[in-house]
């Protein structure tokens, strides 16, 4: 029973990490990236 629980927890954490990484990459480089603001371009001196 303990082995199954450990496997489920490990699988859940791994999938969560992969999902978060995929979402972060999509936000950074996908369609939503056009809506991100660039603070360096806003404050040119």
Curated annotation (Swiss-Prot):
The keyword Iron-sulfur does not apply. Its main location: plastid. The chain crosses the membrane at residues 12-30. It is a single-pass membrane protein. The keyword Disulfide bond does not apply. InterPro entries: PSII_PsbN. One of its GO terms (biological process) is photosynthesis. Keywords: Chloroplast, Membrane, Plastid, Thylakoid, Transmembrane, Transmembrane helix. One of its GO terms (cellular component) is chloroplast thylakoid membrane. It is found in: Plastid, Chloroplast thylakoid membrane. Belongs to the PsbN family. May play a role in photosystem I and II biogenesis. This is Protein PsbN. It comes from Adiantum capillus-veneris (Maidenhair fern).
